């Protein structure tokens, strides 16, 4: 991860800018990097940097966690650089996530999205996800999908 430290920071900050209009909600960068390192140790194949023609264009963060007494897949981050959105790369990320969740024997997956990120919500609905409801005082919407 050290090799791509600046890239993962840039991608994560941009995801916050898109979702919330600023990146202050990300918190301390070192805390994020420590959290990411811990997740990679448990689910190494759940952290993916996406490459296209030799350039890093996206990031995917996946894990398995408990929700309401059952194990579910969780998408912490679907990210593509702006110029690569809307041309099939999102579906490729989704296909990878589905494979990861099947490998871990979960049939349901969740994510949370800012209600202002209408492009992301539209994509999530397109791939069959549905809204569960608002969380964190309405700052995010939990969505779920099934394999």
Placement of each model-derived feature along the sequence:
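Conserved acetyl-CoA pyrophosphate-binding loop and the N-cap/start of the following alpha-helix
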Residues: 84, 88-96
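Conserved GNAT-fold acetyl-CoA-binding loop/helix
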Residues: 13-37
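A short beta-loop-alpha structural element at the N-terminal edge
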Residues: 1-10, 21, 133
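Conserved beta-strand in the GNAT
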Residues: 49, 55-64, 74, 79
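C-terminal "cap" of GNAT-fold acetyltransferases
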Residues: 11, 107-121, 125-147
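Active-site acidic-Proline motif in GNAT/NAT acetyltransferases
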Residues: 81-83, 87, 115-116
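Conserved acetyl-CoA binding element of GNAT-fold acetyltransferases
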Residues: 71-82, 112, 141
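A short helix-loop-beta-strand connector motif used in the catalytic cores of GNAT acetyltransferases and
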Residues: 37-48, 74
């Amino acid at each position: 991860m050290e090799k791509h430290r600046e890239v993962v920071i840039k991608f994560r900050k941009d995801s916050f800018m898109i979702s919330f209009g600023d990146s202050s909600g990300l918190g301390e960068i070192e805390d994020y990097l420590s959290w990411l390192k811990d997740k990679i140790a448990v689910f190494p194949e759940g952290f993916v940097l996406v490459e296209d023609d030799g350039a890093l264009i996206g990031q995917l963060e996946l894990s398995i966690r408990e929700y309401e007494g059952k194990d579910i897949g969780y998408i912490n981050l679907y990210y593509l650089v702006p110029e690569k959105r809307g041309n099939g790369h999102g579906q490729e990320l989704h296909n990878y996530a589905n494979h990861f969740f099947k490998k871990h024997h979960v049939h349901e997956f969740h994510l949370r999205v800012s209600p202002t990120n209408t492009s992301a919500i539209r994509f999530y609905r397109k791939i069959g996800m549905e809204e569960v409801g608002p969380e964190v005082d309405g700052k995010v919407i939990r969505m779920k999908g099934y394999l």
